């Protein structure tokens, strides 16, 4: 493997939607930075069986529903 071509791998804090903070290794940001998630396994419909309400970030869900309202979505 070539040296000095790979990004720095360091510890960051990841803040989940329920406020829980976990530490993990990542190439994102700098050592000690906090990454706040907008959606995670505790809030994503794929993992919650669809029981969680989808978050409308930037009105995209509303725009989609308005565009296709005649199709019964």
From Swiss-Prot:
Q: Which UniProt keywords apply?
A: Ribonucleoprotein, Ribosomal protein, RNA-binding, rRNA-binding
Query: Which GO BP terms apply?
Result: translation
Highest taxon, organism lineage: Bacteria
User: What molecular function terms (GO) are annotated for this protein?
Assistant: rRNA binding; structural constituent of ribosome
- InterPro entries associated with the record: Ribosomal_bL28/bL31-like_sf (IPR034704), Ribosomal_bL31 (IPR002150), Ribosomal_bL31_sf (IPR042105)
The record's section on Gene3D superfamilies has: Ribosomal protein L31
Q: Which SUPFAM superfamilies match?
A: L28p-like
Q: Name one GO cellular component term.
A: ribosome
Biological role stated in the UniProt entry: Binds the 23S rRNA.
Please report which protein family the annotation says this sequence is part of. Answer: Belongs to the bacterial ribosomal protein bL31 family. Type A subfamily.
Q: Which PANTHER family would you find in this protein's record?
A: 50S RIBOSOMAL PROTEIN L31, CHLOROPLASTIC, LARGE RIBOSOMAL SUBUNIT PROTEIN BL31A
The subunit structure is: Part of the 50S ribosomal subunit.
> Mind telling me what this protein is named?
Large ribosomal subunit protein bL31
Source organism per UniProt: Ruegeria pomeroyi (strain ATCC 700808 / DSM 15171 / DSS-3) (Silicibacter pomeroyi)
């Amino acid at each position: 493997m070539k040296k000095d071509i790979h990004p720095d791998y360091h510890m960051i804090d990841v803040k989940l939607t329920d406020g829980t903070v976990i530490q993990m290794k990542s190439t994102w940001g700098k050592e000690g930075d906090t990454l706040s998630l907008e959606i995670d396994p505790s809030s994503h419909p794929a993992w919650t069986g669809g029981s969680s309400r989808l978050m409308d970030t930037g009105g995209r869900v509303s725009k989609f529903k308005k565009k296709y309202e005649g199709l019964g979505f």
